Curated annotation (Swiss-Prot):
A Gene Ontology molecular function term of the record: protein phosphatase 2A binding
Assembly and interaction partners: Part of a complex consisting of a common heterodimeric core enzyme, composed of catalytic subunit let-92 and constant regulatory subunit paa-1, that associates with a variety of regulatory subunits which confer distinct properties to the holoenzyme. Interacts with rsa-2, spd-5 and tpxl-1.
Disruption phenotype: RNAi-mediated knockdown causes defects in spindle assembly characterized by kinetochore microtubule instability and a reduction in centrosomal microtubules, a decrease in outgrowth of microtubule plus ends from centrosomes. tpxl-1 recruitment to centrosomes is reduced whereas microtubule-depolymerizing kinesin klp-7 recruitment is increased.
Function: Regulatory subunit of phosphatase let-92 which recruits let-92/paa-1 complex to the centrosomes, thereby regulating microtubule outgrowth from centrosomes and mitotic spindle assembly ensuring the stability of kinetochore microtubules.
Source organism of the structure: Caenorhabditis elegans
Gene expressing this chain: rsa-1
The protein, known as: Serine/threonine-protein phosphatase 2A regulatory subunit rsa-1
Length: 404
């Protein structure tokens, strides 16, 4: 068992040595080994609860000292924001418990100063949010332990069980199909964590992403009839919209979509080359169809198009040769199809010669003779505009009219 005392702990998410634990999904585990795993988890979780309670007391005391100091507390020009000077913060940290010192290493303090950008001070709201998210991560970690594989990972199925156990019951208005909701929420989480094709994600990545906190805030907003949070993807309303789109496209009512079904997705704005590739990069089932999870991947990629996960997804679709390079031939092929199949409502004077479009897109992505790699695509700030131009007529028109 680990002996990570709060005073010595550097990481907020310690893990049990892997030599002690085997993955739950290992079918070779005996009943004794499974019982042993559960017991280790229980003891570990109880120790973590004690640590969290102590950290919460220390954090509240720290914030109270920050808030109560009138000499070094600045209120900003508008009188709305509260700031603490670096000098004062350093003095307070000197006498703070080790857990608080670990919370604010030098690089974190430096980043907060840059974000605040006001006379070498830190906006106290940043400190409050940091404490809130760390406490939420710690408490979520304890709740996740019984569902995790070995204290470090959790599978998609176990995370669905976790959502069903801890989130569905607190919804005032439950989704009509909780199983689909958990699949939707977990599918979104796995996609945004870049784990679309993986069975498990690391708990540290899950908690660092704050996606579970966003899920909780969505439920809180709907329960209390508040405005949806900025990231509203986990609201029941958004889930219903996605499920309704899926059911509308499911022509055979089998819970699966064929390539022809996606022709009607969002009024048919996505070109056929693009939508067919979705089936080539996803797990398919009967007659090459995709299920709700693959559809959620697609919808999430569109909703969060400025994320790394979405950029990777679009690169994979546009890489027609599946060789890890996006070259001029592929761009020409997709752009030619896109330009030749624009909707009828697009004026003819907005049409562009495919060669001109290819040259413009090539310059946009700084394409070399061999093409560009995924890493180069991710590093290019225009990748979202590029992907939109090649995938759907709406983004194509926005780009063409950008100077009007």
């Amino acid at each position: 068992m680990p002996t990570d005392e709060p005073s010595k702990r550097k990481s907020i998410l310690p893990t049990i040595p892997t030599s002690l634990m085997l993955k739950k999904s290992n079918e070779a585990l005996s009943d004794f080994e499974r019982t042993f795993n559960d017991r280790v988890m229980d003891i570990f979780a109880e120790n973590r609860r004690i640590d969290v309670e102590e950290f919460k007391k220390n954090a509240e005391c720290f914030l109270n000292i920050i808030r109560s100091n009138k000499i070094d507390l600045n209120w900003g020009e508008g009188g709305e924001s509260r700031y603490v000077t670096i000098t004062r913060l350093m003095k307070i940290l000197k006498t703070s418990p080790q857990s608080i010192k670990d919370l604010l290493p030098h690089n974190t303090v430096s980043n907060f100063v840059k974000i605040t950008n006001y006379n070498l001070t830190i906006d106290i709201t940043l400190l409050e949010e940091l404490v809130r998210t760390v406490i939420h991560a710690e408490e979520s970690y304890i709740k996740l332990l019984p569902f995790s594989e070995n204290s470090t990972e959790i599978s998609s199925y176990s995370l669905q069980d976790f959502v069903a156990t801890h989130f569905i019951p607190i919804m005032i208005e439950e989704p009509e199909n909780p199983v689909y909701y958990t699949a939707y929420a977990v599918g979104t989480i796995f996609f945004l964590l870049g784990a679309r094709r993986r069975d498990c994600v690391y708990l540290k990545d899950l908690l660092a992403s704050t996606l579970l906190l966003q899920l909780e805030e969505c439920i809180h907003a709907e329960n209390h009839c508040l405005s949806p949070p900025k990231i509203d993807v986990f609201t029941v309303a958004q889930f219903r919209t996605t499920l309704s789109e899926f059911r509308f496209l499911d022509s055979q009512r089998k819970g699966l979509l064929a390539p022809a079904d996606l022709k009607f997705f969002r009024d048919g704005i996505f070109n056929e080359v693009f939508t067919k590739r979705i089936f080539e990069i996803s797990i398919t089932y009967e007659d090459g169809r995709i299920d709700f999870k693959a559809f959620v991947d697609f919808v999430t990629a569109l909703k969060f198009r400025h994320t790394t996960a979405s950029a990777k997804y679009h690169f994979e679709i546009l890489d027609l040769k599946d060789d890890g390079l996006l070259d001029e031939e592929e761009i020409r092929s997709i752009s030619s199809f896109q330009l030749q199949n624009l909707p009828d409502y697009v004026p003819e004077d907005n049409s562009v010669n495919p060669e001109v479009a290819t040259a413009e897109l090539r310059d946009m992505m700084r394409l070399n003779q061999n093409g560009i790699t995924l890493e180069e695509f991710l590093a290019n700030r225009m990748n979202s505009t590029f992907a939109g131009f090649l995938s759907n007529s709406d983004d194509y028109m926005k780009y063409e009219r950008r100077e009007q």
